């Protein structure tokens, strides 16, 4: 179906052979796992990532499979204006996009002489989310400040993002708990996932209503994940690539039987 080269961060880039089956099966399974996001009436999303990236290519196919309205805006400088006009119901992006949204809002507040208010509101949002995620009772004064900042700050940021976004899926790099908590509190649940070019993008992803900030969620249907004795993450299933293009030595070294050796270290938690 396609040939996508790895980033080459640990050596020369290698061409990953990904098949129609990789994309179709993973899209079908992901659409079911994320049905609260992609099957919602009027679902739409705006992509900022080049389709040379496996994540954007996978999402494009997922959206066709799920019947999602999809827009493209390659110029990240036009990010907020594009969100405001397109009004997506969810976003799929890399962490730098969420960082840009946050930084743009902070810079706008600073320019308007409201930088201190924004920073205090951001701190309140992050602390509030931590209480909620941990199932602890939110202190009265924190709850009061949160409701006040929701009217003064958070609601305006939601409106700047189009006013309809409930979920966002983040991949390709760690999001960072601070950003995750901030967006969670303002009403945008970021579902962080894990995957590589070799796994057609996602192997795991947090699910709506069950997301845990700082984790990459459960394994997607049709995918298997195990942790080797040395802590390395290994993946098998419908998402795993066929081979490295014209590089049988690298292909052989990348597999332990049917298991693809990611080169990343990970662990399972109690869930």
Regions found by a protein language model. Give the residues of each.
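Conserved AMP-binding A3 loop
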Residues: 1-27
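Conserved S/T- and glycine-rich ATP-binding loop of Class I adenylate-forming
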Residues: 6-9, 45, 50, 91, ...
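Active-site loops of AMP-binding adenylate-forming
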Residues: 20, 175, 181-189, 196-214, ...
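Alpha-helix/helix-capping structural signal
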Residues: 21, 96, 173-174, 239
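Conserved AMP-binding/adenylation subdomain of ANL enzymes
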Residues: 24-47, 51-151, 164
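Adenylate-forming
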Residues: 26-32, 100-105, 169, 177-181, ...
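Non-catalytic, charge-rich alpha-helical accessory subdomains
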Residues: 126-192
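Conserved ATP-binding/catalytic segment of the ANL
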Residues: 219-271
């Amino acid at each position: 179906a396609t040939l996508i080269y790895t980033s080459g961060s640990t050596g020369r880039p290698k061409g990953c052979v990904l098949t129609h089956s990789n994309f179709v099966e993973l899209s079908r399974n992901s659409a079911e796992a994320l049905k609260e996001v992609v099957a919602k009436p009027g679902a739409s999303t705006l992509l900022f990532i080049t389709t040379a990236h496996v994540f954007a290519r996978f999402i494009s196919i997922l959206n066709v499979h799920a019947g999602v309205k999809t827009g493209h805006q390659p110029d990240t400088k036009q990010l907020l204006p594009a969100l405001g006009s397109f009004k997506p119901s969810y976003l799929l992006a890399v962490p730098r996009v969420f960082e840009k949204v946050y930084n743009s809002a902070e810079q706008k507040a600073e320019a308007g002489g409201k930088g201190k208010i924004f920073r205090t509101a951001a701190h309140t949002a992050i602390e509030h989310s931590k209480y909620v995620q941990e199932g602890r009772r939110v202190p009265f004064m924190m709850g009061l400040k949160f409701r006040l900042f929701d009217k003064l700050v958070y609601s305006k940021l939601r409106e700047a993002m189009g006013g309809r976004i409930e979920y966002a899926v983040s991949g390709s790099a760690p999001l960072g708990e601070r950003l995750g908590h901030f967006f969670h509190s303002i009403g945008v649940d970021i579902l962080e996932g894990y995957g590589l070019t070799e796994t057609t993008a996602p192997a795991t992803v947090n699910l709506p209503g069950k997301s845990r900030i700082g984790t990459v969620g459960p394994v997607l249907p049709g995918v298997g994940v195990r942790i080797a004795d040395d802590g390395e993450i290994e993946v098998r299933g419908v998402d795993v690539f066929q081979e490295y293009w014209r590089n049988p030595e690298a292909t052989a070294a990348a597999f332990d039987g049917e298991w693809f050796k990611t080169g990343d270290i990970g662990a399972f938690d109690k869930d």
